[in-house]
Amino acid sequence: MSQWHHPRSGWGRRRDFSGRSSAKKKGGNHIPERWKDYLPVGQRMPGTRFIAFKVPLQKSFEKKLAPEECFSPLDLFNKIREQNEELGLIIDLTYTQRYYKPEDLPETVPYLKIFTVGHQVPDDETIFKFKHAVNGFLKENKDNDKLIGVHCTHGLNRTGYLICRYLIDVEGVRPDDAIELFNRCRGHCLERQNYIEDLQNGPIRKNWNSSVPRSSDFEDSAHLMQPVHNKPVKQGPRYNLHQIQGHSAPRHFHTQTQSLQQSVRKFSENPHVYQRHHLPPPGPPGEDYSHRRYSWNVKPNASRAAQDRRRWYPYNYSRLSYPACWEWTQ
């Protein structure tokens, strides 16, 4: 089940996805488990329009948080502005509506709710909805550089999976590169092994949905096969990489977006990328990352190798050979 919210105007106003009958409802204003352990907002993923963040919490949660722990919808926009970026769409993947209301967001920013069950790999319908929303946004925002903000509860597992799934399926990015780019920009590694394994070894998901009539209010899905190059406007032309007019849509689609591939690899190989934003790289397996101290807090039962690399130092950090975080499990 998905819900669009845009009270005035915008490219997403008329869309309404159908699916699950209702979201899972939970009472109370208890803080989500482990929510405090994660950075509020990551960095923009270079070569893309994506930025990931944990769910902001409405004002009623603040009495249970220290002032420095609060992260409200207003705080979200302030932190995005501090990075000299602007949000143009928020995609909410949480499976509840208790954390904040669309009305808490600026009226000028479209909001899309895609109810996504946690812990399990999203189904093909959810993946397609996400791809359709992203491509619709890119199509309508070719002439600006606004970002797509994506969040689940922690802005990590469901968020990372769907962003990486898009990069792999639509942009043709290698799974390892997509996962590493997300990990570095989010400041935390994807944790769920089933998500990582599906991204690494699972099938490419089709970029169209045969169950949705082409004449429906879902609009013409053919533009999913024509991903808009999402490079910043002033950095060169956009390329319409796959013309399909007059042809049937292929079952699977890869785009070899060379500039995006180069951006991913260049970013991943830059050992100083975190110094600009004061974020350490994601933690190696078997270690408990504490972003407040910019160091690795080694678990008592960690391996000898983990104990040997106890702290992170920004000036001698060398890129970990991927996969650095594959053995993290819940």
From Swiss-Prot:
Active site: 152 (phosphocysteine intermediate), 158 (proton donor/acceptor)
GO molecular function ontology, one term from the record: protein tyrosine phosphatase activity
Ranges where the Tyrosine-protein phosphatase domain occurs: 61-208
Result of altering residue 152 to S: Loss of activity. No effect in RNA-binding
Assigned GO CC terms: fibrillar center; intercellular bridge; mitochondrion; nuclear speck; nucleoplasm; nucleus
Keywords assigned: Hydrolase, Nucleus, Protein phosphatase, RNA-binding
Stated family: Belongs to the protein-tyrosine phosphatase family. Non-receptor class dual specificity subfamily.
Purpose of the protein: Possesses RNA 5'-triphosphatase and diphosphatase activities, but displays a poor protein-tyrosine phosphatase activity. In addition, has phosphatase activity with ATP, ADP and O-methylfluorescein phosphate (in vitro). Binds to RNA. May participate in nuclear mRNA metabolism.
Oligomeric and partner information: Monomer. May interact with SFRS7 and SFRS9/SRP30C.
Protein name: RNA/RNP complex-1-interacting phosphatase
Gene expressing this chain: DUSP11
